[in-house]
Protein backbone atom coordinates (compact mmCIF):
# COMPACT_ATOMS: atom_id res chain seq x y z
CA UNK A 1 0.00 0.00 0.00
CA UNK A 2 1.39 3.43 -0.91
CA UNK A 3 1.39 6.25 1.62
CA UNK A 4 -1.10 8.46 -0.26
CA UNK A 5 -4.01 5.98 -0.14
CA UNK A 6 -5.34 5.86 3.40
CA UNK A 7 -8.39 4.90 5.48
CA UNK A 8 -10.34 8.02 6.44
CA UNK A 9 -10.24 9.06 10.08
CA UNK A 10 -13.70 9.57 11.64
CA UNK A 11 -13.12 13.32 11.93
CA UNK A 12 -12.47 13.55 8.17
CA UNK A 13 -15.42 11.51 6.95
CA UNK A 14 -17.59 14.43 5.87
CA UNK A 15 -15.17 15.89 3.27
CA UNK A 16 -14.40 12.35 2.07
CA UNK A 17 -18.12 11.69 1.59
CA UNK A 18 -18.44 14.96 -0.33
CA UNK A 19 -15.77 13.73 -2.71
CA UNK A 20 -17.22 10.20 -2.87
CA UNK A 21 -20.80 11.22 -3.55
CA UNK A 22 -20.04 14.29 -5.64
CA UNK A 23 -22.41 16.25 -3.42
CA UNK A 24 -22.26 19.45 -1.43
CA UNK A 25 -21.52 19.50 2.28
CA UNK A 26 -25.14 19.81 3.43
CA UNK A 27 -26.22 16.83 1.34
CA UNK A 28 -23.20 14.79 2.37
CA UNK A 29 -23.90 15.62 6.01
CA UNK A 30 -27.39 14.14 5.65
CA UNK A 31 -25.88 11.01 4.11
CA UNK A 32 -23.43 10.74 7.00
CA UNK A 33 -26.27 11.05 9.50
CA UNK A 34 -28.22 8.37 7.63
CA UNK A 35 -25.21 6.03 7.59
CA UNK A 36 -24.77 6.47 11.33
CA UNK A 37 -28.49 6.07 12.01
CA UNK A 38 -28.77 2.87 9.98
CA UNK A 39 -25.56 1.40 11.33
CA UNK A 40 -23.75 1.41 7.97
CA UNK A 41 -20.03 1.03 8.63
CA UNK A 42 -17.63 3.60 7.22
CA UNK A 43 -14.50 1.87 8.48
CA UNK A 44 -13.63 1.03 4.88
CA UNK A 45 -14.01 4.60 3.63
CA UNK A 46 -10.71 5.50 1.98
CA UNK A 47 -9.14 8.59 0.47
CA UNK A 48 -6.39 9.39 -2.02
CA UNK A 49 -4.36 12.58 -1.60
CA UNK A 50 -1.93 14.23 -4.00
CA UNK A 51 1.66 15.26 -3.24
CA UNK A 52 0.36 18.39 -1.49
CA UNK A 53 -2.00 16.39 0.71
CA UNK A 54 -5.14 17.55 -1.10
CA UNK A 55 -8.00 15.08 -1.45
CA UNK A 56 -8.26 13.84 -5.05
CA UNK A 57 -10.35 10.64 -4.80
CA UNK A 58 -12.39 8.60 -2.34
CA UNK A 59 -13.73 5.06 -2.20
CA UNK A 60 -15.97 2.96 0.03
CA UNK A 61 -16.13 -0.81 0.44
CA UNK A 62 -19.35 -2.20 1.90
CA UNK A 63 -19.20 -5.78 3.13
CA UNK A 64 -21.98 -8.12 2.00
CA UNK A 65 -22.94 -11.66 3.04
CA UNK A 66 -20.95 -14.51 1.52
CA UNK A 67 -17.49 -12.90 1.85
CA UNK A 68 -18.21 -10.26 -0.79
CA UNK A 69 -18.04 -6.48 -0.83
CA UNK A 70 -19.39 -3.71 -3.04
CA UNK A 71 -17.16 -0.85 -4.17
CA UNK A 72 -18.18 2.78 -4.60
CA UNK A 73 -15.74 5.37 -5.96
CA UNK A 74 -15.82 9.13 -6.41
CA UNK A 75 -16.64 10.60 -9.85
CA UNK A 76 -13.73 10.64 -12.30
CA UNK A 77 -13.40 13.77 -14.44
CA UNK A 78 -10.01 13.50 -16.14
CA UNK A 79 -7.07 11.20 -16.83
CA UNK A 80 -5.02 12.50 -13.90
CA UNK A 81 -7.83 11.75 -11.48
CA UNK A 82 -8.30 8.37 -13.16
CA UNK A 83 -4.69 7.43 -12.46
CA UNK A 84 -5.01 8.45 -8.81
CA UNK A 85 -8.28 6.52 -8.43
CA UNK A 86 -6.70 3.39 -9.89
CA UNK A 87 -3.97 3.52 -7.25
CA UNK A 88 -6.57 4.10 -4.53
CA UNK A 89 -8.60 1.06 -5.60
CA UNK A 90 -5.52 -1.16 -5.70
CA UNK A 91 -4.66 -0.20 -2.13
CA UNK A 92 -8.23 -0.73 -0.93
CA UNK A 93 -8.45 -4.13 -2.60
CA UNK A 94 -5.09 -5.29 -1.26
CA UNK A 95 -6.09 -4.30 2.27
CA UNK A 96 -9.58 -5.86 2.05
CA UNK A 97 -8.45 -9.21 0.67
CA UNK A 98 -5.34 -9.55 2.84
CA UNK A 99 -7.29 -10.26 6.05
CA UNK A 100 -9.14 -13.19 4.48
CA UNK A 101 -12.64 -11.88 5.20
CA UNK A 102 -13.39 -10.84 1.62
CA UNK A 103 -12.97 -13.04 -1.46
CA UNK A 104 -14.88 -11.05 -4.07
CA UNK A 105 -15.31 -7.32 -4.67
CA UNK A 106 -18.02 -6.18 -7.06
CA UNK A 107 -18.65 -2.93 -8.91
CA UNK A 108 -21.52 -1.72 -11.09
CA UNK A 109 -20.46 0.85 -13.66
CA UNK A 110 -22.19 3.05 -16.20
CA UNK A 111 -22.09 1.42 -19.67
CA UNK A 112 -20.95 4.60 -21.44
CA UNK A 113 -18.38 5.79 -18.90
CA UNK A 114 -15.23 4.55 -20.64
CA UNK A 115 -12.91 6.38 -18.26
CA UNK A 116 -14.47 4.81 -15.17
CA UNK A 117 -14.49 1.33 -16.70
CA UNK A 118 -10.83 1.69 -17.68
CA UNK A 119 -9.95 2.61 -14.10
CA UNK A 120 -11.62 -0.55 -12.80
CA UNK A 121 -9.95 -2.85 -15.32
CA UNK A 122 -6.58 -1.18 -14.73
CA UNK A 123 -7.09 -1.91 -11.02
CA UNK A 124 -7.57 -5.61 -11.78
CA UNK A 125 -11.34 -5.96 -12.16
CA UNK A 126 -12.86 -8.30 -14.74
CA UNK A 127 -15.73 -7.16 -16.95
CA UNK A 128 -18.36 -9.87 -16.37
CA UNK A 129 -21.54 -8.70 -18.06
CA UNK A 130 -23.92 -5.92 -18.93
CA UNK A 131 -26.41 -6.46 -16.14
CA UNK A 132 -30.06 -5.58 -16.75
CA UNK A 133 -32.13 -4.78 -13.66
CA UNK A 134 -35.84 -5.52 -14.07
CA UNK A 135 -38.90 -4.90 -11.93
CA UNK A 136 -42.59 -5.74 -11.83
CA UNK A 137 -45.40 -5.13 -9.38
CA UNK A 138 -45.68 -7.76 -6.68
CA UNK A 139 -49.37 -6.97 -6.37
CA UNK A 140 -50.34 -8.28 -9.77
CA UNK A 141 -52.52 -11.35 -9.86
CA UNK A 142 -50.21 -14.35 -9.64
CA UNK A 143 -51.59 -17.84 -10.00
CA UNK A 144 -49.80 -21.11 -9.28
CA UNK A 145 -48.68 -22.97 -12.40
CA UNK A 146 -50.67 -26.00 -13.48
CA UNK A 147 -49.27 -29.35 -12.44
CA UNK A 148 -46.95 -31.16 -14.86
CA UNK A 149 -46.34 -34.89 -15.02
CA UNK A 150 -43.18 -36.01 -13.22
CA UNK A 151 -42.43 -32.43 -12.10
CA UNK A 152 -42.38 -31.42 -8.43
CA UNK A 153 -41.91 -27.90 -7.05
CA UNK A 154 -40.87 -27.99 -3.42
CA UNK A 155 -39.82 -25.49 -0.77
CA UNK A 156 -38.77 -28.25 1.59
CA UNK A 157 -35.12 -27.49 2.44
CA UNK A 158 -32.53 -29.82 0.95
CA UNK A 159 -29.10 -30.51 2.42
CA UNK A 160 -26.33 -28.02 1.69
CA UNK A 161 -24.41 -30.65 -0.25
CA UNK A 162 -27.41 -31.28 -2.50
CA UNK A 163 -28.04 -27.55 -2.99
CA UNK A 164 -24.41 -26.90 -3.87
CA UNK A 165 -24.50 -29.76 -6.37
CA UNK A 166 -27.69 -28.34 -7.89
CA UNK A 167 -26.24 -24.82 -8.13
CA UNK A 168 -23.16 -26.21 -9.83
CA UNK A 169 -25.38 -27.95 -12.40
CA UNK A 170 -27.21 -24.70 -13.14
CA UNK A 171 -23.91 -22.93 -13.86
CA UNK A 172 -23.03 -25.36 -16.66
CA UNK A 173 -23.14 -23.49 -20.00
CA UNK A 174 -25.19 -20.75 -18.33
CA UNK A 175 -25.72 -17.54 -20.30
CA UNK A 176 -26.05 -15.51 -17.11
CA UNK A 177 -22.71 -14.03 -15.93
CA UNK A 178 -20.93 -17.29 -16.81
CA UNK A 179 -17.63 -16.22 -15.24
CA UNK A 180 -18.98 -15.23 -11.83
CA UNK A 181 -19.35 -18.67 -10.25
CA UNK A 182 -15.67 -19.39 -10.96
CA UNK A 183 -14.67 -16.43 -8.80
CA UNK A 184 -16.27 -17.68 -5.56
CA UNK A 185 -16.42 -20.75 -3.35
CA UNK A 186 -19.75 -22.57 -3.58
CA UNK A 187 -20.47 -22.39 0.15
CA UNK A 188 -19.89 -18.63 0.12
CA UNK A 189 -22.42 -18.29 -2.71
CA UNK A 190 -25.00 -20.26 -0.74
CA UNK A 191 -24.32 -18.32 2.46
CA UNK A 192 -24.67 -15.06 0.55
CA UNK A 193 -28.10 -16.05 -0.73
CA UNK A 194 -29.23 -17.07 2.75
CA UNK A 195 -28.12 -13.83 4.35
CA UNK A 196 -29.39 -11.52 1.63
CA UNK A 197 -32.53 -9.73 2.79
CA UNK A 198 -34.82 -11.57 5.21
CA UNK A 199 -34.16 -15.27 4.62
CA UNK A 200 -37.31 -17.38 4.38
CA UNK A 201 -36.80 -20.97 3.17
CA UNK A 202 -40.43 -21.08 2.05
CA UNK A 203 -39.53 -18.61 -0.70
CA UNK A 204 -36.87 -20.94 -2.09
CA UNK A 205 -38.09 -23.48 -4.62
CA UNK A 206 -36.39 -26.57 -6.01
CA UNK A 207 -37.74 -28.05 -9.23
CA UNK A 208 -37.41 -31.82 -9.50
CA UNK A 209 -37.82 -34.06 -12.55
CA UNK A 210 -38.65 -37.63 -11.58
CA UNK A 211 -37.19 -36.93 -8.16
CA UNK A 212 -33.95 -35.42 -9.49
CA UNK A 213 -33.08 -31.83 -8.53
CA UNK A 214 -33.11 -29.86 -11.78
CA UNK A 215 -33.72 -26.18 -11.03
CA UNK A 216 -33.85 -23.61 -8.27
CA UNK A 217 -35.47 -20.25 -7.61
CA UNK A 218 -34.19 -18.19 -4.68
CA UNK A 219 -36.41 -15.30 -3.64
CA UNK A 220 -35.52 -13.03 -0.74
CA UNK A 221 -37.51 -10.32 0.99
CA UNK A 222 -36.22 -6.82 1.75
CA UNK A 223 -38.90 -5.04 3.82
CA UNK A 224 -36.82 -1.87 4.24
CA UNK A 225 -36.91 -1.35 0.46
CA UNK A 226 -40.50 -2.62 0.18
CA UNK A 227 -39.45 -5.21 -2.37
CA UNK A 228 -38.84 -8.86 -3.09
CA UNK A 229 -35.83 -10.02 -5.08
CA UNK A 230 -35.24 -13.04 -7.28
CA UNK A 231 -31.69 -13.46 -6.02
CA UNK A 232 -30.99 -16.51 -8.17
CA UNK A 233 -32.84 -18.45 -10.84
CA UNK A 234 -31.41 -21.33 -12.82
CA UNK A 235 -32.01 -24.70 -14.45
CA UNK A 236 -29.62 -27.59 -14.92
CA UNK A 237 -28.56 -28.06 -18.52
CA UNK A 238 -30.68 -31.19 -18.96
CA UNK A 239 -33.81 -29.30 -17.85
CA UNK A 240 -33.57 -26.39 -20.29
CA UNK A 241 -35.67 -25.79 -23.41
CA UNK A 242 -38.61 -27.73 -21.98
CA UNK A 243 -40.76 -24.83 -20.75
CA UNK A 244 -39.71 -25.52 -17.17
CA UNK A 245 -38.22 -22.06 -16.67
CA UNK A 246 -41.67 -20.52 -17.06
CA UNK A 247 -43.13 -23.19 -14.78
CA UNK A 248 -40.60 -22.45 -12.04
CA UNK A 249 -40.85 -18.67 -12.41
CA UNK A 250 -44.64 -18.69 -12.21
CA UNK A 251 -44.40 -20.63 -8.97
CA UNK A 252 -41.81 -18.21 -7.57
CA UNK A 253 -43.99 -15.21 -8.46
CA UNK A 254 -46.99 -16.90 -6.85
CA UNK A 255 -45.05 -17.35 -3.60
CA UNK A 256 -43.72 -13.79 -3.70
CA UNK A 257 -47.19 -12.33 -4.24
CA UNK A 258 -48.24 -13.65 -0.84
CA UNK A 259 -45.87 -11.13 0.74
CA UNK A 260 -46.90 -7.47 1.28
CA UNK A 261 -43.94 -5.91 -0.54
CA UNK A 262 -44.79 -3.57 -3.41
CA UNK A 263 -42.42 -4.81 -6.12
CA UNK A 264 -40.24 -7.72 -7.14
CA UNK A 265 -36.80 -7.21 -8.68
CA UNK A 266 -34.22 -9.28 -10.51
CA UNK A 267 -31.06 -8.83 -12.55
CA UNK A 268 -30.03 -10.69 -15.69
CA UNK A 269 -27.10 -10.75 -18.09
CA UNK A 270 -28.13 -8.92 -21.26
CA UNK A 271 -26.68 -11.80 -23.31
CA UNK A 272 -29.18 -14.19 -21.74
CA UNK A 273 -31.86 -13.67 -24.38
CA UNK A 274 -34.07 -16.62 -23.32
CA UNK A 275 -34.23 -15.32 -19.74
CA UNK A 276 -34.94 -11.75 -20.89
CA UNK A 277 -37.82 -13.00 -23.01
CA UNK A 278 -39.21 -15.06 -20.14
CA UNK A 279 -39.04 -12.20 -17.64
CA UNK A 280 -40.57 -9.73 -20.09
CA UNK A 281 -43.42 -12.15 -20.77
CA UNK A 282 -44.19 -12.11 -17.04
CA UNK A 283 -44.42 -8.33 -16.86
CA UNK A 284 -40.90 -7.40 -15.80
CA UNK A 285 -39.65 -4.13 -17.28
CA UNK A 286 -36.09 -2.85 -17.62
CA UNK A 287 -35.12 -0.33 -14.95
CA UNK A 288 -31.37 0.12 -15.40
CA UNK A 289 -28.38 -1.30 -17.25
CA UNK A 290 -25.00 -1.49 -15.54
CA UNK A 291 -21.66 -3.07 -16.33
CA UNK A 292 -20.90 -5.73 -13.71
CA UNK A 293 -17.21 -5.98 -12.81
CA UNK A 294 -15.54 -8.12 -10.18
CA UNK A 295 -12.18 -8.80 -8.61
CA UNK A 296 -11.58 -12.09 -6.83
CA UNK A 297 -8.90 -13.41 -4.53
CA UNK A 298 -9.28 -16.76 -6.30
CA UNK A 299 -6.99 -17.47 -9.24
CA UNK A 300 -9.72 -17.94 -11.81
CA UNK A 301 -10.67 -16.45 -15.13
CA UNK A 302 -13.82 -16.05 -17.12
Describe the predicted segments one by one.
Residues 81-95, 235, 241-258, 276-281:
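Conserved acetyl-CoA-binding loop-helix of GNAT-fold acetyltransferases
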Residues 21-51, 60, 180-213, 218:
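Active-site rim helix/loop that mediates acceptor-substrate recognition in acyltransferases
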Residues 111-129, 242, 246, 270-288:
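Conserved active-site alpha-helix within GNAT-family acetyltransferase domains
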Residues 32-96, 209, 217-228:
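Conserved donor-binding loop and adjoining core beta-sheet/short helix segment
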Residues 132-151, 262, 267-273, 288-302:
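C-terminal "cap" of GNAT-fold acetyltransferases
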Residues 1-17, 150-167, 172-176:
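A short beta-loop-alpha structural element at the N-terminal edge
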Residues 79-150, 155-157, 293:
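Acyl-donor-binding surface of acyltransferase catalytic domains
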Residues 105-109, 230, 264-268:
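Conserved hydrophobic beta-strand within the GNAT/NAT acetyltransferase core sheet
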